[in-house]
């Protein structure tokens, strides 16, 4: 125990309902001299608190969605905004998943659903109410995890910043972004199998040939045109949020990312009173 706990500032113990198990352990550790406490009502009480507070925070905060077809560097934009001190929730990061059929390439396994919800709450609670929170356009499912209902409802019809770029630039970006994955042919074949019900047999044969030939440009281009772009366009058709800015680029995605971030910061888009 000393090896695990000595460096901790404060220990918080809990069991399912906050009964004898956690209280007994708290007594022992307190007698040792550790600074510790018990969650009243146990984990069940904590879960109720997380759900209720997430709902309240979701309704009281204002969000802007960074939207755009796959390969526009939306996650890069969020990361850059966060590095510049803006409020960002990287849902894909919290879910340890890239939110697409290639999402499983991240080595870290996805958290449990309850841990994912706690991650969202812990991120939300630290934000200032007078500033916008930036999120990426997502479906409600990220891998095997589901975005909490009230949080998803709050962001679904939020204001939008839309990024457009030519497909050749998006293809180049995806090849660089997934460079390690592109070398793992077995993983590619496994994931492409998930598309068999969504695209034709002829297209699947073409994709398999591109993989075998290591023609990653054609592979990425085909995946965009056959699946990703259509999926994004369908999802955007259902959204009712106000479009506050659309960027139409014909440049490297990295340059577009820098431009969008600079625009947001220079124009104080992150301040709630701006709109």
Q: What are these language model-derived features?
A:
Residues 12, 37, 64-66, 87-89, ...:
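Hydrophobic/aromatic beta-strand patches that form the interior of the parallel beta-sheet core
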Residues 1-10, 48-53, 185:
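Helix-loop module immediately N-terminal to the HCX5R catalytic loop
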Residues 83-154:
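Conserved nucleotide-sensing/catalytic segment adjacent to the nucleotide-binding pocket
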Residues 154-159, 164-275:
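Conserved NTP phosphate-binding and transfer environment spanning the P-loop NTPase/kinase superfamily
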Residues 1-40:
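Catalytic cysteine-centered active loop of the rhodanese-like fold, especially the PTP/DSP P-loop
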Residues 34-48, 90-95:
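A short glycine-rich beta-strand->turn/loop micro-motif centered on a GG-aromatic cluster
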Residues 40-66:
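Glycine-rich adenosyl-nucleotide cofactor-binding module
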Residues 20-21, 62-83:
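Glycine-rich phosphate-binding P-loop
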